[in-house]
Design a protein with these regions (language model features):
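Rhodanese-like catalytic fold shared by cysteine-dependent sulfurtransferases
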Residues: 1-20, 26-58, 67-111
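Short, surface-exposed ligand- or partner-binding patches at beta-edge/loop junctions that are enriched
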Residues: 62
Length: 111
């Protein structure tokens, strides 16, 4: 694990199997393709719904490329959470050949 802006960060290969993943992308991005088992909480709703994020373990925060997840990681860290920003986001996840699922009935893809 590394740090970006003094916040914990990890590559997609460093995410432990079964670790909680928080996807902060918007609904249409989530619907097109996401990590199976991830929790969806758009960055635009994070302040109102932060209590839905587990407090008792590291949570790996992901977006499309890493910008929104870095902002979400900074926000959550202020309030006692243990967030880890996922470097490269869903783009890196897909590039690594890791599986994604779709909610649309079409082939999963990263928007």
């Amino acid at each position: 694990m590394d740090t970006v802006n003094n916040l914990p960060s990890a590559t997609v290969d460093e995410i432990p199997e079964g670790a909680p993943v928080l996807d902060v992308r918007e609904q249409n991005e989530w619907d097109a393709g996401h990590i199976e088992g991830a929790q969806h909480l758009p960055l635009s709703q994070l302040a109102e719904r932060a209590e839905e994020v587990p407090l008792d373990q590291d949570v790996y925060v992901i977006c499309r490329s890493g910008g929104r997840s870095l902002r979400a990681t900074a926000y959550l860290a202020q309030y006692g959470y243990d967030p880890v920003n996922v470097l490269g986001g869903m783009g890196a996840w897909a590039d690594a050949g890791k599986p994604i699922v779709s909610e649309t009935g079409e082939a999963a893809r990263v928007l």
